[in-house]
Amino acid sequence: MNASVAIGGHKKIVIMGDWTEKACLWMASIGKSGLGKTPLNQKCGGAFLKKTQSGWMQEFDAAKKEWERAVKNAKEDRLDEPERPVHKVMYANPITMETLRQIHSENSAGLGLLSDEILSVLEGLNQYKGKGNDRQTVLSLWNCDSDETPTLNESRSIPSVFVPISGGIQEDLLRKIISDENARDGMAARFLFNHLIQSPNPVTVERFKEIGELLSGSQGRIILERTLGKLICLRDQPNQVTMESNAEDLLLNFQHYLKREGRQSNDQVFAAYAKLQRYIFRVALLLHYLFEREPDSADLNEDTANKTITVMMFFIANMKRAYGTIELNKKEMVARKILNKVAELGGHASVRDVKQPLRKSAKSGEFDSILKLLVETGELIQTEDGKAVQISLP
């Protein structure tokens, strides 16, 4: 996701005719609170983006002070006022639509909206408060088209919009994204989903320290920062990437496969498949810039196309799981939570250890009846250990 922010909106991939796509991703990471979504993002390039943008802020502060002195001198000498320096911005926390337009109009490569909670991003853009044109404007951000916004005081023009969006969401709140309203106008379908899975057993203190040392001085971190740095250096340079014929055939055939899959699905999932068809080429463009040594001068090759299909299969599986979660009734949701909790506890735990954390999700009698059904259907194995009742995954 951080690569989507770094690459900016001046890079496009040519599919056919005048159909082009940018590497703009909208990502919702699904996982319970406290799972470590933010630290993971920081380790996967977020810290580097923050460091880079902080450097830009320092440069802007210095340039602004110099500009203020120049303005003062110009007034004294009755000269034209010098041009105000531009504050370079690559990403922002949840902001209003008005602020987004103001920043984007000064940063033509676009800016990402990154937050711990994806709902706060949408609420900041008045997604749930605004009606009519406000909602349509939010939807149009995903399309990466131009934005002409006349106001009482001025008219801001953004020739080419680029606003990647990323944030986390708890599984219980998924219905706020995949709602009937969001399904009708395509808001839900615009999101890629990523389910975060917790390891059954926490790492030991020794292993935790070892991992920290590996990350701080690893060659992987150096390569990651070097790659993101390359993208940032290239982000202000417009370029259109074409595909080698073999790569083009692979991706277009995969797009055809998604069309067929979509037609066999319900209306909500059909809309998701339609957006995933465009995401094929957005992801391909992003991978091209990540792996190609000279991405601005090279065609997208067959190897990148195959990598793209692998990544897209991951997102398709996560989409199916996300939409499947919405279709679960309350009993099915509690059953999933019981199974997930047993898995989190290492695949084997006492009934009490599973039941206690889920007391807000199900009453005692409801929990017991669903647990009994899971045991009867073979989803869980129940054994007695003295007075304690143990349950485990098969």
Outline where the language-model segments fall.
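Phosphate-handling catalytic cores of nucleic-acid transaction enzymes
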Residues: M1-P394
